[in-house]
């Protein structure tokens, strides 16, 4: 249906998990496609509240075939994301299996809820039958798995109400219709005095410091709504405001960055394959949303070595550089310590 969220006209698609686990029937496909077409014609955001077991397999002969079968949903997802720049925001509100998982994965951003969200191509029972592996749902595809390990999802909330509140905040800062500027609100002073920034940086550029303290002196109220905070912590990405204007922020974190249990620490100021992919996705999203990007760089370059090469550092780095180079929004660069190597160029140098 159609509604208003945070003052914005939006299209909403929501599954009812009390009816056949929210599975897709032939009529479901027709309704989703119609909703997507309205969003594309009107150029308004579309919100997916997903709680679906995917296709109702006994009825798949009416779901898959034809020009307007289930695959067209994903075609429309891709059109909106790559060409039309129609914002797509998904919340995984329950179990999302197979096609129910691809729908949010093709959105711009994904919100998940701790303890109740599940997203995967197959559930624990299917995994047990297909591979013999016994795994619980949270480990297989829960909110922490997808916001800390797989990086498929981008924001994690403690409960449904918090998830919906965060979605409202996100929608409230989305780009306005063509020709209308982003909403500018009353500015707040930074959390730290800008003049104090000089005392925060070490005299020796090799020593560590917390980049968040630098951002405290730049951003309104020092507030950064961080994007994927538990993924690639050596790179900070997020949404903020400066003088009341919305901006996207990308910054290098310094020091030794602790990894997940069993994972080796990373060196701050170095771009790893995982951080390159995280930043590339964030740049592409900010570009679609028409947000200026502030790069706060303190970078020594890209990671080298056999492990980095095996992880595809060249491919990931190229994705980072391509996203930065092709973004058409304003890019502002602040070098706070030093910048060198290809990392300088990747960080919009």
What are these regions (language model features)?
Residues 1-349:
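Ligand-binding clefts of soluble mixed alpha/beta catalytic domains
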